[in-house]
């Protein structure tokens, strides 16, 4: 570690603040317009400037309503002072022994296999069953029949378990050392999530409500495409994580190459806290380099842990080298350890463990564990790491908003105290045997069976008839659930993302990020349409925000949209199995979009006179290109800059509604318009003839007038494609990607196989699965995820525009 790096590390530590949810997690829309219908959150990096008095004053001067009577140079707003609840000693003790953890990774990294071992070692299940149902049982967390058939996780599954582990490092008293204290029982809520990109919403909503996560990686494949996506989701919600390098028994496993990928590809400050004893088929255990102890799994299915100070000579040098590397990496993330390191003072195992906990919970470091879930090795030390290094609910600050205050008002910290007013978030819905099953994270207060709770979105008061804790598809009835817990309710009608309170507060929390669908296809029942067809589509839409249904206005076909072919195939199959409705589907369609590349002004008057009261509305302004907000996914906006009363306030929502209607159907190919901001600068109204309809039509006409002047283009979804195949087929694979007009981003060769990363238009990827199987003799595999929308080639846009024009003329 250079002197400059050491100094920089110390400066960074002096400026580091404790772990706090970022603006997105605090659900804190900080910029809103009094005339707009929705808040437009700014990026978290702008939080400091937004909360300054100068910003608030300039904000008020610029955005005050035309009808407001605010004086010149608005005064600084004063917000209500609140007395926050306090944690009792009972709460503190309970929360210190509570963990809410998700297990996420790329597909086939071993998440569900790992969760199965966790459940077995914690005593939640009596025997271990494998993922693909080879023993006709299947893994506990893959409870859906389709999951066991296909060997993949489709829905996230929740469970809970108790684990006895040593006291966390930061709770150690004087004279106590890490790992040598009395063991205590920890309650762990676990959510196992899908690894396939098509089911990314399951990962999204799980991470929204969790306090920590385990990122599982394959010791051979390392960081893969969905690993990058999961890492991005964890960063979006500021979720501290541990990394677990699985499949250490596989040929070609190299954990330190994977750690290098974590640092290089994910820009993660990560280091191993273990080194393997043996490699590949000889993998026998791990060395805990924090305490310098060898750990082996013995007994029936590895249920006995044997620790010894006798580290095999073959790995002693490696263990000492990686321990020094761990201390150096960790000293850049923890000020206390950095001081010891720079002063060349003795560093004890307790010093390292305490620094690991501080740096992990504050998102500055990721400890890396190793093992093989399928070989029952290394799972128990990982559980100890979850209890030692991941935060408890009281160490993560969650925020709520007051629905009675403007959206830019300060957020309210939620305190996980049992006697505080109830605040909970419904993050997932399922259709259970006894009605709707609503998964809930309780952030504050206590939720009791039979109690009355309020839906902050609808204002409705509902009763909780049944309260359960989930164990995959099994349920355990409970009378009450306290702050920090995850549970499920029966018989409560709501939507995903709804906030519930006990009625004593007006708090609300915002929901999770929902990506837009990228693929669509038409669907109809094989025979006569039955009520079950509509019932199934309605249910699937309610459960999955990324599954959309609409009826095409021209063909009158029912169109379903989702995140990929597999996503839609699963729902078609579920419709057949669960509702006995066999369906016929059309050819998949790509979700094309239209956008503008330049700003364009408009000055449009809508006038209609037919005797008596007519219609009059004039709007002046511009449309501008707009980047997608990476935190909220919002890519369209309406901005009112009118100062004065040229357009009465009651007509502004009608103008915004007209803008939203105009976005539904583009002028080049008829596809929805995205990436566009509507700026209203001025206009005029008529005392008699102006009404909402007139201004709505004026907005539509103005948008269409300006759209053609703003150099519009057609966009298509582009996918990041990752292909893994034997090295002898590399030439064929590259040739096929070039044939599909793909752009090769990266190629990595290891041993006898290679990994190719490319960006290819989704429209050019249809049929690739069969082609890859044929050219690699069935040995190649690929995965793809949505990257962004990019302009189509000019000749393609011309063809699409001509086809759309002919279609319109033929009507």
From Swiss-Prot:
Transmembrane segments: none annotated. HAMAP family: EF_G_EF_2_B. It comes from Cryptococcus neoformans var. neoformans serotype D (strain JEC21 / ATCC MYA-565). GO terms for cellular component: mitochondrion. Its main location: mitochondrion. One of its GO terms (biological process) is mitochondrial translational elongation. SUPFAM superfamilies: EF-G C-terminal domain-like, P-loop containing nucleoside triphosphate hydrolases, Ribosomal protein S5 domain 2-like, Translation proteins. This is Elongation factor G, mitochondrial. Residues 1-64 form a transit peptide. Pathway: Protein biosynthesis; polypeptide chain elongation. Residues 96-394 form the tr-type G domain. Disulfide bonds: none annotated. Keywords: Elongation factor, GTP-binding, Mitochondrion, Nucleotide-binding, Protein biosynthesis, Transit peptide.
């Amino acid at each position: 570690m250079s002197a400059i790096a050491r100094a920089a590390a110390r400066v960074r530590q002096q400026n580091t603040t404790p772990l706090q949810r970022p603006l997105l997690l605090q659900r804190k829309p900080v910029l809103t317009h009094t005339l707009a219908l929705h808040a437009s959150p700014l990026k978290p990096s702008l939080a400091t400037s937004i909360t300054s008095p100068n910003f608030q004053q300039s904000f008020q001067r610029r955005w005050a309503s035309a009808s407001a009577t605010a004086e010149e140079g608005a005064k600084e707003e004063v917000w209500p002072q609140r007395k926050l609840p306090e944690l009792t000693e009972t709460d503190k003790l309970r929360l210190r022994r509570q963990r809410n953890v998700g297990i996420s990774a790329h597909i086939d990294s071993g998440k569900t296999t790992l969760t199965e071992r966790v459940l077995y070692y914690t005593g939640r299940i009596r025997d271990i069953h494998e993922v693909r149902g080879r023993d006709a049982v299947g893994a506990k967390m893959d409870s859906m029949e389709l999951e066991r058939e296909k060997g993949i996780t489709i829905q996230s599954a929740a469970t809970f378990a108790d684990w006895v582990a040593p006291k966390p490092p930061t709770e150690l008293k004087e004279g106590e050392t890490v790992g040598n204290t009395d063991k205590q029982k920890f309650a762990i809520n676990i959510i196992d999530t899908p690894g396939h990109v098509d089911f990314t919403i399951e990962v999204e909503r799980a991470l929204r409500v969790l306090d920590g996560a385990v990122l599982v990686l394959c010791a051979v494949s390392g960081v893969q495409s969905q690993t990058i996506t999961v890492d991005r989701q964890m960063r979006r919600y500021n979720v501290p994580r541990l990394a677990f390098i699985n499949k250490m028994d596989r040929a070609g496993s190299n954990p330190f190459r994977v750690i290098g990928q974590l640092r290089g590809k994910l820009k993660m400050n990560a280091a191993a806290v273990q080194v393997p004893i043996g490699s590949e088929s000889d993998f026998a255990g791990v060395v805990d380099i924090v305490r310098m102890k060898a750990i082996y799994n013995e007994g029936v299915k590895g249920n006995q842990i044997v620790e010894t100070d006798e580290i095999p000579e073959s790995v002693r040098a490696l263990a000492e080298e990686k321990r020094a590397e761990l201390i150096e990496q960790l000293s850049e993330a923890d000020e206390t350890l950095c001081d010891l390191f720079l002063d060349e003072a003795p560093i004890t195992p307790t010093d390292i463990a305490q620094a690991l906990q501080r740096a992990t919970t504050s998102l500055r470091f990721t400890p890396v564990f190793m093992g093989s879930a399928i070989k029952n090795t290394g799972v128990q030390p990982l559980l100890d790491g979850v209890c030692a290094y991941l935060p408890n609910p009281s160490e993560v600050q969650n925020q709520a908003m007051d629905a009675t205050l403007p959206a830019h008002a300060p957020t309210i910290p939620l305190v996980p105290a049992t006697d505080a007013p109830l605040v909970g978030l419904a993050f997932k819905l399922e259709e259970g045997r006894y009605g709707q099953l609503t998964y809930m994270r309780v952030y504050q207060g206590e939720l009791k069976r039979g109690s009355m709770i309020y839906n902050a979105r609808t204002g409705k008061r509902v009763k909780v008839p049944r309260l359960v804790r989930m164990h995959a598809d099994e349920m355990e009835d409970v009378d009450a659930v306290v702050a920090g817990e995850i549970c499920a309710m029966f018989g409560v009608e709501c939507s995903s993302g709804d906030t519930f309170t006990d009625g004593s507060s007006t708090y609300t929390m915002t929901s999770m990020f929902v990506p837009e669908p990228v693929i669509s296809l038409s669907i109809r029942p094989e025979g006569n349409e039955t009520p079950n067809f509509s019932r199934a589509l309605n249910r699937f839409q309610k459960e999955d925000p990324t599954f959309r249904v609409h009826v095409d206005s021209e063909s009158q076909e029912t169109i379903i949209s989702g995140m990929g072919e597999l996503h839609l195939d699963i729902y078609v199959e579920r419709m057949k199995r669960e509702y006995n409705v066999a369906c016929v589907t059309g050819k998949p369609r790509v979700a094309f979009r239209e956008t503008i590349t330049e700003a364009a002004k408009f000055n449009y008057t809508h006038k209609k006179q037919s005797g008596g009261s007519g219609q009059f509305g004039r709007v002046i302004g511009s449309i501008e290109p707009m980047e997608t907000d990476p935190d909220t996914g919002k890519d369209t906006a309406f901005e009112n800059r009118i100062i004065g009363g040229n357009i009465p306030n009651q007509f502004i929502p009608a103008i915004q509604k007209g803008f939203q209607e105009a976005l539904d159907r583009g002028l080049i190919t008829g596809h929805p318009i995205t990436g566009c901001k509507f700026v209203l600068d001025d206009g005029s109204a008529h005392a008699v003839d102006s009404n909402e309809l007139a201004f709505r039509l004026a907005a539509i006409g103005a948008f269409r007038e300006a759209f053609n002047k703003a150099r519009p283009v057609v966009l298509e979804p582009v996918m990041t494609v990752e292909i893994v195949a034997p090295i002898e087929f590399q030439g064929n694979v590259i040739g096929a990607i070039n044939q599909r007009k793909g752009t090769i981003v990266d190629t990595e060769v290891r041993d006898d196989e290679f990994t190719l990363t490319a960006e290819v238009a989704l429209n050019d990827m249809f049929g690739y699965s069969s082609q890859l199987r044929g050219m690699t003799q069935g040995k190649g595999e690929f995965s793809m995820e949505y990257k962004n929308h990019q302009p189509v080639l000019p000749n393609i846009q011309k063809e699409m525009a001509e086809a759309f024009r002919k279609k319109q003329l033929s009507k």
